[in-house]
Amino acid sequence: MTMDLFDQLPHDPWIETLAPGAVVLHHYARQQAALLFADVIAITTAAPFRHLITPGGYRMSVAMSNCGQVGWVSDKQGYRYSSIDPLTEKSWPAIPARLMTLAVDAAQQAGFSQFEPDACLINRYEAGAKLSLHQDKDELDLRQPIVSVSLGLAAVFQFGGLAREAKCLRVLLTEGDVVVWGGPSRLNYHGVLPLKAGFSATTGAYRINLTFRRTR
């Protein structure tokens, strides 16, 4: 997408439906972006970003951290949630009130009124980093939605179906966009195409993504 086309996108908040139970709340958190990023800095000072290793032994291109009662971790033993940060050997930082309120309100806006996350995965993308198509299925209660908040550089989000080979929608996510999916779309495959280099007044050379989940 060229900058000319980017400039032509609507600047007021608007809702885009991806599938039943899945929407993008465009610009929903844009006005809070700097404050949200300040929370991210505080969290990752206590629980630094790191590149996790997949069960197959590959280093993920996206740097990760967590906050909440549990955090998502990966190593050669598998994917799982842990109450202890394996890097610091301490509990993860609590989800800040501002982040919690944003996640709950966005879920309600998308039609999920009972969402109360206990985990927030923080992903940091640099130029070239990506997230391959995958399902979020490590949570015990799949009736709860996923809430995903974008900060910083724009990225192309892929949202597919229940099978990996299903055709994917491609959506440009910019700062403050919030994707919410649940219900019949809860296990849909999704991912992020390689990030293009750029500069954000909020996050510098990075894209930050906050993914809120109810794990238990």
Predicted feature residues:
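Non-heme Fe(II) oxygenase metal-center motifs and adjacent flexible, charged/small-residue loops
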Residues: M1-R216
